[in-house]
From Swiss-Prot:
Molecular-function GO term, any one: toxin activity
Name recorded for this polypeptide: Dermonecrotic toxin SdSicTox-betaIIB1ai
Entry binding sites for Mg(2+): E25, D27, D85
Domain of life, source organism: Eukaryota
Organism: Sicarius cf. damarensis (strain GJB-2008) (Six-eyed sand spider)
GO biological process terms on file: killing of cells of another organism; lipid catabolic process
The keyword Lipid metabolism belongs to this UniProt entry's keyword annotation: yes
List of catalytic residues: H5, H41 (nucleophile)
Class of the enzyme per the UniProt entry, highest EC level: lyase
Cofactor(s) in the UniProt record: Mg(2+)
Lineage of the organism: Eukaryota, Metazoa, Ecdysozoa, Arthropoda, Chelicerata
Length: 274
């Protein structure tokens, strides 16, 4: 999975897909009451990027629904995964449950259209810190209460704050989540980061019977040397400001026979068995 990073303006979706991304990440900003308002990162952000691009969240969902719906004029077959970077660290943890309700309802109304949409992308909920785990509980409660629990099959969970892996496991255990879990490891492209935690996450992913990590990706990679390092370690995905660079690295002799771009037929919730 090549995840285009910080794709917050509607016009950026095609831009990143044209560069080779098959997944996009966008930031969701909330008001003080936990209501999702806009797709927006804000300052500071990655080096060399404009931090202020934005869209109204519901309008963004309306557009991305078309882009991921077969037979729609806007359909782009390669886009198979949407990563929602939930900016919950900007609001009180007491509002995390309300935020989960709101995002679930907006996905129901504007993306899935309560069963009337054929939009097919998988959804990855990126939560910054484990302290905001009530977002997940609310999201799942809302799907159940609204009568659309089946959409859980399309939704995965990821904590992105580089927290202790065992601490994350404990929270997932509290929530009763033992599948459809991704793990991210990384830092803004402005800085370098070691591989200790990334290696630990990959080791846990590959441990038989360990059900708290199905996929691991590294972020935000812009240098080809770091992309190569991550691929050698065996990541499932790379988040980048430059998907075209990832494509070029994947075509190199060292990687061409080991990796390929994920398609809709690849289940993002299953561990890869090479």
């Amino acid at each position: 999975w090549i995840m285009g990073h910080m794709v917050n303006a509607i016009e950026q979706v095609d831009e990143f897909l044209n560069l080779g991304a098959n997944a996009i990440e966008f930031d969701i900003d909330f008001d003080k009451d936990g209501i999702a308002q806009i797709t927006h990162h804000g300052i500071p952000c990655d080096c060399g990027r404009k931090c202020t691009k934005k869209a109204i969240f519901t309008e963004y969902l309306d557009n991305i629904r078309q882009v991921t719906t077969p037979d729609d004029p806007k359909f782009r077959e390669q886009l198979v995964l949407l990563a929602l970077d939930l900016k919950l660290q900007r609001i009180s943890s007491a509002k995390a449950y309300r935020a989960g309700e709101d995002v679930a309802k907006k996905l129901l109304d504007h993306y899935w259209q309560r069963g009337n949409s054929k939009a097919r992308a998988y959804i990855l909920l990126n939560i910054p810190l484990v302290e905001d785990y009530e977002f997940i509980r609310a999201f799942k409660d809302t799907l159940k209460n609204e009568g659309y629990e089946s959409y859980n099959d399309k939704v995965g969970i990821n904590f992105t704050g580089n927290e202790d892996l065992d601490k994350i496991r404990d929270v997932l255990e509290i929530l009763g989540i033992h599948k459809q879990v991704w793990r991210a490891d990384g830092i803004t492209s402005c800085f370098a980061r070691g591989t200790e935690r990334l290696k630990e996450a990959l080791k846990k992913r590959d441990t038989p019977g360990y059900n708290y990590i199905n996929k691991v990706y590294a972020w935000t990679l812009v240098r080809k040397s770091i992309m190569r390092r991550s691929l050698r370690l065996g990541v499932d995905g790379v988040m980048s400001n430059n998907p075209d660079r990832v494509i070029k690295v994947l075509k190199e002799k060292e990687f061409a026979d080991k990796f390929r771009l994920a398609t809709y037929n690849d289940n993002p919730w299953e561990k890869f068995r090479g």
